[in-house]
Amino acid sequence: MKTKVILSQQMASAIIAAGQEEAQKNNWSVSIAVADDGGHLLALSRMDDCAPIAAYISQEKARTAALGRRETKGYEEMVNNGRTAFVTAPLLTSLEGGVPVVVDGQIIGAVGVSGLTGAQDAQVAKAAAAVLAK
Protein backbone atom coordinates (compact mmCIF):
# COMPACT_ATOMS: atom_id res chain seq x y z
CA MET A 1 0.00 0.00 0.00
CA LYS A 2 1.23 3.47 -0.86
CA THR A 3 1.20 6.24 1.67
CA LYS A 4 0.72 9.84 0.71
CA VAL A 5 1.82 13.00 2.45
CA ILE A 6 -0.98 15.56 2.70
CA LEU A 7 -0.22 19.28 2.53
CA SER A 8 -1.42 20.57 5.90
CA GLN A 9 -2.39 24.08 6.92
CA GLN A 10 0.78 24.24 9.01
CA MET A 11 2.88 23.32 5.96
CA ALA A 12 1.04 25.87 3.83
CA SER A 13 1.75 28.56 6.43
CA ALA A 14 5.45 27.62 6.42
CA ILE A 15 5.52 27.89 2.62
CA ILE A 16 3.92 31.35 2.75
CA ALA A 17 6.41 32.48 5.42
CA ALA A 18 9.40 31.24 3.41
CA GLY A 19 8.13 33.01 0.30
CA GLN A 20 7.60 36.24 2.21
CA GLU A 21 11.12 35.98 3.63
CA GLU A 22 12.60 35.61 0.13
CA ALA A 23 10.56 38.54 -1.17
CA GLN A 24 11.44 40.80 1.78
CA LYS A 25 15.13 39.94 1.43
CA ASN A 26 14.94 41.45 -2.07
CA ASN A 27 12.59 44.34 -1.17
CA TRP A 28 9.85 42.81 -3.32
CA SER A 29 6.11 42.84 -2.77
CA VAL A 30 4.24 39.77 -4.01
CA SER A 31 1.17 37.64 -3.63
CA ILE A 32 1.79 34.00 -2.64
CA ALA A 33 -0.79 31.23 -2.99
CA VAL A 34 -0.54 27.61 -1.85
CA ALA A 35 -2.77 24.90 -3.32
CA ASP A 36 -3.16 21.22 -2.48
CA ASP A 37 -2.48 18.51 -5.07
CA GLY A 38 -6.01 18.96 -6.45
CA GLY A 39 -5.37 22.64 -7.10
CA HIS A 40 -7.57 23.85 -4.23
CA LEU A 41 -6.44 26.96 -2.37
CA LEU A 42 -5.07 26.37 1.14
CA ALA A 43 -3.39 29.70 1.88
CA LEU A 44 -3.00 33.13 0.32
CA SER A 45 -1.01 36.20 1.27
CA ARG A 46 -0.78 39.51 -0.57
CA MET A 47 2.02 41.66 0.77
CA ASP A 48 1.65 45.40 1.28
CA ASP A 49 1.91 47.45 -1.94
CA CYS A 50 1.34 44.40 -4.16
CA ALA A 51 -1.23 44.94 -6.93
CA PRO A 52 -4.60 43.34 -6.10
CA ILE A 53 -4.66 41.37 -9.37
CA ALA A 54 -1.56 39.50 -8.24
CA ALA A 55 -3.68 37.70 -5.63
CA TYR A 56 -5.80 36.21 -8.40
CA ILE A 57 -2.85 35.39 -10.67
CA SER A 58 -0.87 33.69 -7.88
CA GLN A 59 -3.82 31.37 -7.17
CA GLU A 60 -4.08 30.43 -10.84
CA LYS A 61 -0.34 29.73 -11.03
CA ALA A 62 -0.55 27.49 -7.95
CA ARG A 63 -3.54 25.61 -9.35
CA THR A 64 -1.87 25.11 -12.74
CA ALA A 65 1.37 23.82 -11.17
CA ALA A 66 -0.57 21.46 -8.89
CA LEU A 67 -2.83 20.01 -11.57
CA GLY A 68 -0.10 19.89 -14.22
CA ARG A 69 2.49 18.46 -11.83
CA ARG A 70 5.11 20.80 -13.29
CA GLU A 71 6.38 24.35 -13.16
CA THR A 72 4.16 26.80 -15.02
CA LYS A 73 7.25 28.06 -16.84
CA GLY A 74 6.94 24.97 -19.06
CA TYR A 75 3.54 26.13 -20.31
CA GLU A 76 4.81 29.64 -20.90
CA GLU A 77 7.69 28.23 -22.95
CA MET A 78 5.27 26.11 -25.01
CA VAL A 79 3.20 29.19 -25.86
CA ASN A 80 6.28 31.27 -26.63
CA ASN A 81 7.57 28.49 -28.89
CA GLY A 82 4.44 28.48 -31.03
CA ARG A 83 2.01 26.15 -29.24
CA THR A 84 -0.46 29.01 -28.89
CA ALA A 85 -3.42 26.67 -28.34
CA PHE A 86 -2.30 26.41 -24.71
CA VAL A 87 -3.59 29.94 -24.06
CA THR A 88 -7.13 28.57 -24.46
CA ALA A 89 -6.67 25.53 -22.21
CA PRO A 90 -9.11 25.53 -19.28
CA LEU A 91 -7.67 25.79 -15.75
CA LEU A 92 -4.27 26.70 -17.12
CA THR A 93 -2.17 29.78 -16.53
CA SER A 94 0.81 29.85 -18.83
CA LEU A 95 2.85 32.35 -16.81
CA GLU A 96 6.09 31.58 -14.98
CA GLY A 97 5.87 31.56 -11.18
CA GLY A 98 4.01 28.36 -10.28
CA VAL A 99 6.08 25.55 -8.73
CA PRO A 100 5.08 22.10 -7.42
CA VAL A 101 5.69 21.32 -3.74
CA VAL A 102 7.52 18.00 -3.48
CA VAL A 103 7.92 15.94 -0.29
CA ASP A 104 9.50 12.48 -0.32
CA GLY A 105 9.37 12.44 -4.12
CA GLN A 106 5.63 13.13 -4.21
CA ILE A 107 3.94 16.28 -5.46
CA ILE A 108 1.66 17.28 -2.60
CA GLY A 109 0.61 20.68 -3.90
CA ALA A 110 2.04 23.84 -5.41
CA VAL A 111 2.92 27.44 -4.73
CA GLY A 112 2.16 30.33 -7.06
CA VAL A 113 3.70 33.78 -6.87
CA SER A 114 2.75 36.95 -8.73
CA GLY A 115 3.68 40.61 -8.62
CA LEU A 116 7.11 40.71 -10.26
CA THR A 117 8.73 39.44 -13.45
CA GLY A 118 8.22 35.77 -14.22
CA ALA A 119 11.78 34.89 -13.20
CA GLN A 120 11.46 36.79 -9.91
CA ASP A 121 8.08 35.20 -9.20
CA ALA A 122 9.67 31.78 -9.81
CA GLN A 123 12.60 32.63 -7.52
CA VAL A 124 10.21 33.39 -4.66
CA ALA A 125 8.07 30.31 -5.43
CA LYS A 126 11.08 27.98 -5.46
CA ALA A 127 12.36 29.40 -2.17
CA ALA A 128 8.90 28.93 -0.68
CA ALA A 129 8.51 25.34 -1.91
CA ALA A 130 12.01 24.43 -0.73
CA VAL A 131 11.10 25.03 2.91
CA LEU A 132 9.54 21.56 3.14
CA ALA A 133 12.61 19.88 1.68
CA LYS A 134 14.70 20.99 4.66
UniProtKB/Swiss-Prot annotation:
Disruption phenotype: No effect on glycolate utilization. It comes from the Bacteria. Pfam families: HbpS-like (PF03928). Signal peptide: none annotated. InterPro entries: GlcG_carb_metab_protein, PduO/GlcC-like, PduO/GlcC-like_sf. Gene3D superfamilies: Haem-degrading domain (3.30.450.150). Induction: Part of the glcDEFGB operon, which is induced by growth on glycolate, under the positive control of GlcC. Also induced by growth on acetate. Expression of the glc operon is strongly dependent on the integration host factor (IHF) and is repressed by the global respiratory regulator ArcA-P. PANTHER family: PROTEIN GLCG, SLR1406 PROTEIN. Belongs to the GlcG family. This is Protein GlcG. It comes from Escherichia coli (strain K12). The gene is glcG.
